[in-house]
Regions:
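Bacterial N-terminal signal peptides that target proteins for export
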Residues: 1-10
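Hydrophobic helical h-region of N-terminal Sec-dependent signal peptides
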Residues: 10-16
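C-terminal motif of bacterial Sec signal peptides marking the signal peptidase cleavage site
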Residues: 18-22
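Bacterial signal peptide processing site
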Residues: 24-27
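Surface-exposed interaction/gating patches
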Residues: 36-49, 137-186
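Tryptophan-paired
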Residues: 52-108, 163-204
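Structured interaction patches on ligand/partner-binding surfaces of diverse proteins
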Residues: 102-134, 194-223
Length: 223
């Protein structure tokens, strides 16, 4: 009798284990099918009008079809301007995306990259150039408004000294974004590589991303 009970107990345990394993697998499959969202705003710091492209990436297809007309998500963005914000929905399992930029007029000067998205991401996609080479970079938006000042961070195409209120606060790194710095004067409170950065088109109390080069400001984008 004891042997029978032991046999039944073992069978029950094995059945429960199989059921729990099955539930776990189902849960993971469900997570992979959940709908996620991301937002991307496109910054064209190049010297020409540009189209920005986005397309879901798969391991098998690579960059195939990225520059097809159907993948344009922000068209005819003027030089040194910010394009529209693109809302992108995807299944959790398909969280890789290809991004590209090209000359709007010629269709040439193509640059591309890929990145992995997180649900709820709010991103800047920046097209920039250094020493004749074009690049795309993706950084997260980060609004940090401060009363009575311009709160700014800088994305640079090289290494430049940054002065705030006449004092050096940092040196930029190529393709990287700095921390935020509080600037109290819109006309001459900020200098990059010896160039005064005019912030007077902005508003006190707001935060901004500045794309800069050796000659100063190229794009000013509201966070």
């Amino acid at each position: 009798m004891n042997n029978v009970n032991k046999g039944l107990g073992l069978a029950v345990l094995l059945g429960l284990s199989a059921a729990l394993t099955g539930c776990g697998e189902g849960s993971e499959e469900l997570k992979e099918q959940l709908s996620h969202d991301a937002k991307m705003s496109f910054v064209n710091s190049l010297d020409y009008m540009a189209d920005f492209h986005a397309k879901r990436r798969s391991i098998s297809s690579g960059y195939s079809g990225l520059f097809d007309s159907g993948s344009v998500v922000s068209a005819d963005v003027p030089a040194k301007e910010v394009g529209k914000t693109y809302s992108y929905s995807y299944k959790a399992i398909n969280n890789m995306i290809n991004l590209g930029v090209k000359d709007s007029n010629s269709g040439e000067k193509q640059e591309r990259m890929n990145t992995t998205l997180k649900d709820g991401a709010n991103l800047w996609v920046i097209a920039w150039e250094a020493d004749g080479e074009r690049s795309l970079s993706v950084i997260s938006k980060k609004q940090e408004n401060k009363a009575d000042v311009f709160n700014v961070r800088l994305f640079a195409n090289g290494s430049y000294d940054v002065m705030v209120g006449g004092e050096k606060v940092t040196t930029t790194e190529k393709g990287q974004v700095t921390s935020y710095y509080e600037v109290s004067s819109c006309a001459d409170g900020l200098e990059v590589a010896g160039n005064a950065i005019d912030l007077c088109n902005g508003d006190f109390g707001q935060s901004y991303l500045l794309v800069v080069d050796a000659n100063g400001k190229r794009v000013m984008a509201s966070e």
